[in-house]
Amino acid sequence: MGHSDGDHGSDLSADDSPWSEGSWSDDDDEGSLSFEDSGEGSDAESDEPDAPAVEESDSSEDEVAPRNTIGDVPLEWYKNEEHIGYDITGSKIKKRDREGRIEAYLRNADDAKNWRKIYDEYNDEEVQITKEEAKIISRLLKGKTPHTNVDPYPDYVDWFEYDGKGHPLSSAPEPKRRFVPSRWEQKKVVKLVRAIRKGWIKFDKPKEEPNFYLLWGDETDTADNKRQGLSYIPAPKPNLPGHEESYNPSVEYIPTQEEIDSYQLMYEEDRPKFIPRKFDCLRSVPAYEKALREGFDRCLDLYLCPRTRKKRINIDPESLKPKLPSKKDLRPYPRTCYLEFKGHNGPVKSLSVEATGQWIASGSSDGTIRVWEVETGRCIKVWNVGGVVHRIAWNPSPDRHILAAVVDHDLLLLNAEVGDEDAQMKTKGLLQIEELAQEEDNGDKKPAVKWVKHEKFDGIMLIHHKAVSTVEWHFKGDYFTTVVPSGDSRAVLLHQLSKKHSHHPFRKLPGLPIAAVFHPSQKMFFVATKKFVQVYDLQKAQLVKKLESGVREISSISIHPGGDNVIVGSKDGKLCWFDTDLSTRPYKTLKNHSKDITNVTFHRKYPLFASSSEDCTAYVFHGMVYSDLNQNPLIVPLEILRGHSSSDGRGVLDCKFHPRQPWLFTAGADSVVRLYCD
């Protein structure tokens, strides 16, 4: 159905119009237009519904004709003219004179309502807005609706109510096209794939960024990292005067004339810049002689010296320390002295523990070898060999109770006379020798070693051509090695107890040998010279590795039961840990002792190792070696063992671990053997 004119007019009646609540009227007081509330919105309805509504307006704006008659043309056309349009008679309408800044300032000062006047450029007149219009403008500037009675966010009214209805708005079933792949999309994909394969569609390759950098510059100085180019760096402030520049210093701070004369003999950079003097009062202080010079030097520094910002990193010193486990979690380890073995009259130079840990043997410079019972500390056997015992080693086999002792220049094999009868019989059988065994090498006139029966002690004496320093057993107990430091090609010798045979495997060594030890499980042989450790393969007769210690002189060496780690002690108090799988250089270097390290040793069962020194101390460390090759060994210092006294400048001469318990034996120059337990 269509609407008639009357119906259309009724839709725009005063009841439906947003302006029905008010009317436009002339404001006599203000001389302008204002919007007033009529309060007759409810009575504006027509009693006759079919009567056409007539729009009426009380505004005088519709009655006043526009004063400008130029029409709808740009005002720029009359910008430089004296008139603006023409009147009905054709005369020019002159522009009103604009007031200057002084007149406008005076009018603002005199008229309090002048801020509400607006210049109408189209009609060339000033219009004063009312308070209501000012409020409307203020609301528009704030982004609000012009009138307060308009609600911009009315309550939402849901016109559709599903409750109580029998049918929904739409209950059509889902179309089949939503479940079936699109055939047209498949064709488009096939076309795109074919075009990509044939090269019709080419993708843009990613741009390669230049991988250049400043070779001699700092990354912080690049233009990319700077904000708005060069940043201002304030100049450093000059140093403030200190107490030394006091005009009335204490007498002890005033230098004498001799000290002042001695300053002239010093270099200029070392010479003090200010000499304190004493004055009665502050007004007696003369002008500073170097004020002009120092001011000029500072100006040169500010003008010529470049300034850079140095980033200071505040690092907590505690965070730099390695995180080590607590000592309580690493127990047991030797901490306190449990027992003392006394009986020697001279410094105890060497120790050796029996394979089961029941007996311990000690050798002293008083010419005696003693065997002690570990649990009771009772001495059960004493041999007076008549010479200084430099080294002693117990056979590692449990059924071979044989002691190898370096006495003066030669090596003595003794029956320890401990154990059951079967072990005694086997030990005596190994120490039997029928005739003189002289082993001669090819081309040598003199034998390297003579195996001689020692009738007094019912043992064997191995007579070397030069003095022997150390002796070490193979882990099976049949082979042992001796080191003759000044023996040239015969410096390192290998001996076989069962065959009474000796030979020297090395024709030439790169340095003077200090010690030699066997690998605990493989056919490897370690020879320590003054600065290097050579690792040889006895089966292939070739050099495998050469470990560089970096110390002044090696004094002792020990092999980890796993065979892949080596510790070396030096005469400058350093202990080096080598991880042979990692590098030929030390993994860790520990500087704990103030004097020479006399011996280093590993524990066979526990992750412990120790070092003894002539400073009368023995250090115990936790050394855990992991089966994972990606994890480095863990080294933790545990305890410093003290108790030995110094004799002739010497302290602890040897240290050995118990084979089964976390106990440590130490031999001191004070003729005492100490046992440290947990």
Swiss-Prot record:
InterPro entries according to UniProt: BOP1/Erb1 (IPR028598), BOP1_N_dom (IPR012953), WD40/YVTN_repeat-like_dom_sf (IPR015943), WD40_repeat_CS (IPR019775), WD40_repeat_dom_sf (IPR036322), WD40_rpt (IPR001680)
Key word RNA-binding present: no
Gene3D superfamilies according to UniProt: YVTN repeat-like/Quinoprotein amine dehydrogenase
Subcellular location(s) per record: Nucleus, Nucleolus; Nucleus, Nucleoplasm
Molecular functions per Gene Ontology: ribonucleoprotein complex binding
Bias-annotated ranges (Acidic residues): 24-63
Transmembrane annotation, as ranges: none
Region (Disordered): 1-73
Record-given protein name: Ribosome biogenesis protein BOP1 homolog
Annotated function: Required for maturation of ribosomal RNAs and formation of the large ribosomal subunit.
Repeat positions for WD: 343-384, 386-424, 463-505, 508-548, 549-588, 592-631, 647-678
HAMAP family assigned: BOP1 (MF_03027)
Biased segments, Basic and acidic residues type: 1-10
Coiled-coil regions, chain positions: none
GO BP: maturation of 5.8S rRNA from tricistronic rRNA transcript (SSU-rRNA, 5.8S rRNA, LSU-rRNA); maturation of LSU-rRNA from tricistronic rRNA transcript (SSU-rRNA, 5.8S rRNA, LSU-rRNA)
Similarity section: Belongs to the WD repeat BOP1/ERB1 family.
